[in-house]
């Protein structure tokens, strides 16, 4: 069954005409990303050549996807909007709350028991408001979306930063916070800064141990975690043909680690085949009828530098297997360099655990190719040194892989098969270790490797690679093992090599599944009652944030001056805290607990200016709030890098933090702060960061004249009585300033 088929038929009936109108209006050829963007303007009469990276534009996405950890807050906000049903097709996916422990057979029932209150809430809200519901065990949101919902030329938003995964099938798919999702769910315009365009020219063909994952790992080394901010990466070139749709999805998925708005590949024969193999023949045919406009125009491909803001050249034939890390996904290292780099940087060289899965690499093809390496270990008599853990991407993939013997290949080398869920990738991992603070190394096929993320241990050195390389390094038990050149010993002491990975792109017998775990939206469920217990510690109805009082912010104590990387994991930790994602008061206790205090180098230990004691960040914030005092956070570059979790914006707002002053922001987090009525400001001169002292009282003036492109003034009142003043800037437009004045975007929408 093709889901939402009437919406898809209507879309394709007008898509090519919309693109033609766009070309006629802007009077030039278009890139593929531009075609999709222009075809989704909220008001087509406003079509014009927008300034990339500068102007905000209103769009009308086709659909919304939400995962269970972020859906709670998004749907709590939606329930306050007074709507009878969602305005566009939407889905909820229960994948983040399932803890990986001993294996799927026991872990899934335990998760259903532990999270029953949340699952019941999400299921009832989905039924009441006409939202598709994918229950626990159904699969990871982005793999399920690719298999069932993604379509060439479409636009979607998702309350998860790896939503761009659907770009592998030709969508502009953007990760957003819950408040942005509510805009789309209620039929309002969805605002986005017109992205810059980075063209990635692929030539050659991957071979040997090189995989699509290595393509994006190499690009991360080139562009870094900030290089894609406010940009779409559009892939083109002859190299496209050799990469499968799921491989392209992997590349788009980790574009999120570049800070990119999204990434996109054009429609091609591989995409058509993927649609047909996943039971969507009609969509493949509709896309084929529009194929000329599901790619960049010929003139663009002939002279790409005239149409893209930046060009990145990648020769696939020269791509090597990579290991990126530790602690940041842009620390790119070809595996051939690890023998020198590892000891030079004092990396722990023994690989204790290898983890294959996540929304980035859990397709049938990923598992089939990884299994071809596992199979060699037992066929060639090689002792496996590390522990291997597998998370299939969906129930359809798990069922098919089990039927085809793929899971048996993993089990024969001692692998644990976990639930079709995120698990360790989002910190939902009960790691069995005698000391979860010791220095050690793990290798994953995941997307992020921030300190503490997988297992809570700050001394776990996590490296990211392909599923194939992950299995090879787990077998070898060494971080510096290069499967293309190095040998291993079999049980007789003979030197043997691992052959390059092989595996089918699609299952030869086709995909199969008994129960996908899906409950379709139905008009019959409109009278379903949604119950939230007032005594719940996991769910809490939202109260509106207070509007701006019309005054400047004066004498704010510094809550924390963070040093170095401060991701959304540092601001609102996941793992054991995921259970509170529907309860703002409770989850606010983790505010900035992972951030490093610039004045003492410690995490979650800041000075409470009211009594001079050093306490947890949330404790200090609550003390200020109890006295009616607003506070401020000061940070360095790319503040809020990482996931789309709006809790990282709602928590400081709830605890009366009014300002985040940073050297720069990650795109999604900056938007989330604006949506919640906070002030996200940047230093005009980054060196002014160094002027901020631990005991400062900080004032922000000029708010009565707050306007687009205006400057505000920060005054630091130091403990010794001296002062420093400097200007700060912002990216707020008129609408976003209205959100601030109303107290939040939701407050503003409610007044309209």
Question: How would you describe each model-predicted region?
Answer:
Residues 3-4, 68, 151-284, 416, ...:
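Mobile "lid/hinge" segments at catalytic clefts and subdomain interfaces of large enzymes
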Residues 8-11, 15, 20-195, 581-633, ...:
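Long, structured ligand/cofactor-binding scaffold of large enzymes
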Residues 42, 46, 51-60, 74, ...:
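Terminal amphipathic helices with adjacent charged low-complexity linkers/tails
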Residues 47, 147, 151, 243-249, ...:
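Short glycine/threonine-rich loop-to-helix capping motif typified by GTGT followed
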Residues 76-80, 305-401, 405, 524-659:
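Non-catalytic terminal/interface segments that mediate subunit docking, oligomerization
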Residues 379-429, 435, 643, 649, ...:
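Extended C-terminal subregions enriched in glycine
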Residues 488-505, 670-739, 746-749:
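Acidic, glycine-rich flexible loop/linker segments
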């Amino acid at each position: 069954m093709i889901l939402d088929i009437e919406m898809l038929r209507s879309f394709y009936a007008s898509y090519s005409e919309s693109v033609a109108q766009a070309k006629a209006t802007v009077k030039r050829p278009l890139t593929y990303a531009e075609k999709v963007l222009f075809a989704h303007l909220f008001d087509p009469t406003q079509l014009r050549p927008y300034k990339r990276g500068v102007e905000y534009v209103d769009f009308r996405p086709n659909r919304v996807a939400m995962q269970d950890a972020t859906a709670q807050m998004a749907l709590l906000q939606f329930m306050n909007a007074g709507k009878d049903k969602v305005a566009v097709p939407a889905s909820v996916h229960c994948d983040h709350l399932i803890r990986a422990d001993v294996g799927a057979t026991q872990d899934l029932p335990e998760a259903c028991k532990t999270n029953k209150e949340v699952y019941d809430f999400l299921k009832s809200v989905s039924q009441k408001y006409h939202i598709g519901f994918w229950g626990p065990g159904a699969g990871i949101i982005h793999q399920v979306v690719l298999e069932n919902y993604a379509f060439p030329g479409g636009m979607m938003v998702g309350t998860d930063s790896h939503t761009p995964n659907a770009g592998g099938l030709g969508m502009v798919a953007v990760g957003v916070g819950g408040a942005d999702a509510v805009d789309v769910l209620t039929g309002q315009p969805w605002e986005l800064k017109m992205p810059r365009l980075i063209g990635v020219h692929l030539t050659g063909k991957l071979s040997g141990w090189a995989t699509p994952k290595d393509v994006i790992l190499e690009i991360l080394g080139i562009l870094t975690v900030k290089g894609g901010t406010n940009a779409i990466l559009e892939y083109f070139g002859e190299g496209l043909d050799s990469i499968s749709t799921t491989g392209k999805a992997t590349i788009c998925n980790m574009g999120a680690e570049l800070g990119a708005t999204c990434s996109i590949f054009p429609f091609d024969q591989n995409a058509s085949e993927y649609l047909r193999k996943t039971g969507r023949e009609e969509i493949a045919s509709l896309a084929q009828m529009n194929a000329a406009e599901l790619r960049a125009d010929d003139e663009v491909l002939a002279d790409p530098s005239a149409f893209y803001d930046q060009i990145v050249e990648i020769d696939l034939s020269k791509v090597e297997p990579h290991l990126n890390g530790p602690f940041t996904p842009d620390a790119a290292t070809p595996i051939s360099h690890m023998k020198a780099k590892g000891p030079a940087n004092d990396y722990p060289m023994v690989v204790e655990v290898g983890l294959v899965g996540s929304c980035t690499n859990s397709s049938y093809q990923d598992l089939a190719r990884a299994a071809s390496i596992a199979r060699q270990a037992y066929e060639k008599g090689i002792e496996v040194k590390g522990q291997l853990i597998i998370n299939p991407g969906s129930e359809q993939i798990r069922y098919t892989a089990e039927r085809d013997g793929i899971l048996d290949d993993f089990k024969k080398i001692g692998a644990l098969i976990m639930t079709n869920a995120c698990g360790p990738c989002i910190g939902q991992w009960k790691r069995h270790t005698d000391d979860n603070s010791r220095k050690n190394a793990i290798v994953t096929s995941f997307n992020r490797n921030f300190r503490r993320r997988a297992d809570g241990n700050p001394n776990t050195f996590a490296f990211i690679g392909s599923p194939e390389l992950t299995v090879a390094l787990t077998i070898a038990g060494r971080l510096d093992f290069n499967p293309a050149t190095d040998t291993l010993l079999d049980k007789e002491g003979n030197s043997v090599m691992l052959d390059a990975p092989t595996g089918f792109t699609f299952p030869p017998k086709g995909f199969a599944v008994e129960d996908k775990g899906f409950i379709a939206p139905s008009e019959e469920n409109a009278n379903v009652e949604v119950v939230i217990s007032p005594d719940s510690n996991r769910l809490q109805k939202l109260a509106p944030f207070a509007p701006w009082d019309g005054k400047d912010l004066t004498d704010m104590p510094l809550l924390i001056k963070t040093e170095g990387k401060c991701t959304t994991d540092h601001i609102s930790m996941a793992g054991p805290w995921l259970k509170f994602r529907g309860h703002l008061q409770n989850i606010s206790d983790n505010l900035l607990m992972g951030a490093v205090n610039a004045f003492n180098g410690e995490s979650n230990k800041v000075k409470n200016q009211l009594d001079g004691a050093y306490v947890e960040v949330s404790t200090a914030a609550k003390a200020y709030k109890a006295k009616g005092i607003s506070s401020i956070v000061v940070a360095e570059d790319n503040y809020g890098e990482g996931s789309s979790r709006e809790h990282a914006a709602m928590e400081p707002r709830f605890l009366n933090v009014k300002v985040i002053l940073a050297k720069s922001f990650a795109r999604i987090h900056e938007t989330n702060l604006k949506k919640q009525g906070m002030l996200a400001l940047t230093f005009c001169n980054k060196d002014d960061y160094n002027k901020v002292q631990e005991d400062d009282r900080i004032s922000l003036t000029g708010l009565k004249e707050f306007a687009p492109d205006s400057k505000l003034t920060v005054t630091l009142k130091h403990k010794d009585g001296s002062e420093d003043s400097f200007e700060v800037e912002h990216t707020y437009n008129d609408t976003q300033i209205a959100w601030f004045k109303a107290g939040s975007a939701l407050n503003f929408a409610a007044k309209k």
